[in-house]
């Protein structure tokens, strides 16, 4: 262990060569000595290198317009949400990179994000794509599985364990990752009236999430599950973890419309309600509306950025099927091409797939299962039948479960129903 030199003979710093009489302090190590001036200089060199690394990291960070452009390659529509997310994540990681080099004393607070939109509108996919663009660890949690500590269910700390696992247990990377908590609307307070039963999966979970959302040193069990006194914990600092929460918030538009449409008591109070367009409730959504829905003020206070996603139209879903880099149609085309089979979808088929997803209230989330079901027989047959050249999916395949049109390499074209026996 290093100790201050007190011997009578004068020693010299092993780094600069100055004797003890010319410096304030000299510390001895294992056969070497270092003076206070060299310690200060070493610290300055390290700080300068860290500052240079932080500046480089900031320069390498994609700008908001660049982030949105990359989001556009994978996510169709939702321009408002993409702009909000692009600015928010840019500011978040810029804040992190400047923390070590800012000497002004101005502390930049973390800004977590809430995404509000119907099922299948792209909330989870947006968060996933952001993490991919920024090359940071990402984890998804379902709020409905969480309970307050001490009750049956999953502790909120296990969300952090998922992030750590996805970062291959690289603690530094995990502490700069993104966590998406889905179905956040399902942990709203069960009722405004006081109940003798503790709300362990509603308000209790919101209370448990407060600290990790704001920034704390959380103790995480390395193998998951409940905490045990004798179990060694992993300490994770959540200060720089970006939390994105999402939910459908069914009925929130009525809360907004009622607030905007209310008039004071008097003539015309009942019949004079303002008409609120579909877009207006999204533009006028406030934190107060979310509190009215059932989120506690302390929870909302830790999620300052709120944006909404639109319900996807038939046109949007058709574009989702065909346009993004990893569009479903492109994926299945690639899959069948590995068996030397061309796959085509008619315009009628694409529209039928989109209409069916909307009718099932699944949005983009329902597209894959519809396409998968329509191609099941084809994917079963093509690996074994070498003479299949092309498969065409028509509207009837989607709506009436008809067989797709198959073209054979011998130029024999017939309905699959005639060929399959």
UniProtKB/Swiss-Prot annotation:
Gene Ontology biological process terms, A to Z: cell division; proteolysis involved in protein catabolic process
UniProt record similarity statement: Belongs to the ClpX chaperone family.
GO terms for MF: ATP binding; ATP hydrolysis activity; ATP-dependent protein folding chaperone; protein dimerization activity; unfolded protein binding; zinc ion binding
One cellular component term from this protein's GO annotations in UniProt: HslUV protease complex
InterPro entries in the cross-refs: AAA+_ATPase (IPR003593), ATP-dep_Clp_protease_ClpX (IPR050052), ATPase_AAA_core (IPR003959), Clp_ATPase_C (IPR019489), Clp_protease_ATP-bd_su_ClpX (IPR004487), ClpX_bact (IPR046425), P-loop_NTPase (IPR027417), Znf_CppX_C4 (IPR010603)
Subunit record text: Component of the ClpX-ClpP complex. Forms a hexameric ring that, in the presence of ATP, binds to fourteen ClpP subunits assembled into a disk-like structure with a central cavity, resembling the structure of eukaryotic proteasomes.
ClpX-type ZB domain ranges (all copies): 1-54
Metal-binding keyword on record: yes
The organism of origin for this protein: Lactobacillus gasseri (strain ATCC 33323 / DSM 20243 / BCRC 14619 / CIP 102991 / JCM 1131 / KCTC 3163 / NCIMB 11718 / NCTC 13722 / AM63)
Domain of life: Bacteria
List of residues binding ATP: 118-125
Keyword Chaperone: yes
Protein name (database record): ATP-dependent Clp protease ATP-binding subunit ClpX
Binding sites annotated in the UniProt record for Zn(2+): 13, 16, 35, 38
Keywords recorded for this protein, A-Z: ATP-binding, Chaperone, Metal-binding, Nucleotide-binding, Zinc
Record function comment: ATP-dependent specificity component of the Clp protease. It directs the protease to specific substrates. Can perform chaperone functions in the absence of ClpP.
